[in-house]
UniProtKB/Swiss-Prot annotation:
Fe cation 1 binds at residues 8, 10, 52, 194. It comes from Xenorhabdus bovienii (strain SS-2004). One of its GO terms (molecular function) is metal ion binding. The keyword rRNA-binding does not apply. Belongs to the cyclic nucleotide phosphodiesterase class-III family. Its cofactor is Fe(2+). It is an enzyme of class 3 (hydrolase). This is Probable cyclic nucleotide phosphodiesterase XBJ1_0953. Its EC number is 3.1.4.-. Keywords: Hydrolase, Iron, Metal-binding, Nucleotide-binding. InterPro entries: Calcineurin-like_PHP_ApaH, CNP_phosphodiesterase-III, Metallo-depent_PP-like. Pfam families: Metallophos (PF00149).
């Protein structure tokens, strides 16, 4: 099962507004064309968007996002990030009624169960998973324990070595890592860091996908960016492989 992971698209309030001299709409359009191209070569079973869809939580940005995602004609899960506004996203969903979005944020095939967990703290850049959400996640893991388990979320749980984002990562990362180790979760995917990374933690793989918008300059503690952008293709095969497509 091949899954595309998009993250940190940061669509601005209007198309002409750039973010650090980057037109995020142009990047998103390009990425969607690349996904179309990849779909002509191999089957993409699922797309997961792991947060910061819109930079300002704007309804029109969400409308653009949903229309582009629908054009890919592939089931997708959308997770919100700290830049998103849940109320506006829900308004747009109600108006647009997208066909391919998976509202449960759960997916499984014969071997894998994929789910999402909310890490957003309203009004804050850092992430935190509430006790209720941790308990619900554990319930889902136990219920689907006959599958290999993959979890996606917005905030990264392990430092990437870039202080500007490691200062606002997942605050209670230890709790979810211990939960995943307890239940032998195979994979954690996230965004937020604008810094692609892959770790192997005991028997689990953890991964931060490259941002669709821009990357932070690796190691920076001030606002310095790299204009490279991209996404990951994750092959949930017995060996589990990750291909980063960076442009």
């Amino acid at each position: 099962m091949k899954v595309v992971n998009l993250t940190d698209i940061h669509l601005t309030r209007n198309r002409d507004k750039k973010l650090f001299d980057v037109n995020t709409y142009d990047n998103f359009d390009f990425v969607c064309e690349e996904i179309h191209r990849i779909q002509n070569l191999t089957e993409i079973e699922l797309i997961i968007v792991s947060g910061d869809i819109a930079n300002d939580g704007d309804v029109e940005a969400y409308r653009y996002f949903l229309n582009k995602m629908e054009s890919l004609k592939t089931p997708y899960i959308s997770i919100l990030g700290n830049h998103d506004l849940n109320k506006n996203f829900e308004i747009t969903l109600a108006e647009e009624k997208p066909k391919y979005i998976i509202s449960s944020r759960e997916y499984n095939n014969d071997n894998w169960y994929i789910t999402a967990v909310d890490t957003v703290v309203e009004g804050e850049d850092y992430g935190f998973i509430t006790q209720d959400n941790l308990a619900e996640l554990e319930r889902k893991i136990i219920t689907n324990s006959n599958f290999n388990i993959a979890i996606f979320m917005h905030h990264h749980a392990m430092p990437v070595g870039t202080p500007i984002v490691d200062s606002c990562m997942l605050n209670n990362a230890k709790a979810i890592l211990e939960l995943c180790e307890k239940h032998r979760v195979k994979f954690i995917g996230s965004g937020h860091a604008h810094t692609p990374r892959v770790w192997h933690h005991n028997n689990m793989t953890a991964c931060v996908s490259p941002a669709v918008s821009f990357q932070w300059l690796s190691g920076t503690n001030t606002v310095k960016i790299s204009k490279g952008f991209g996404f990951n293709v994750i092959d949930f095969s017995p060996d589990l492989s990750i291909t980063s497509c960076i442009y």
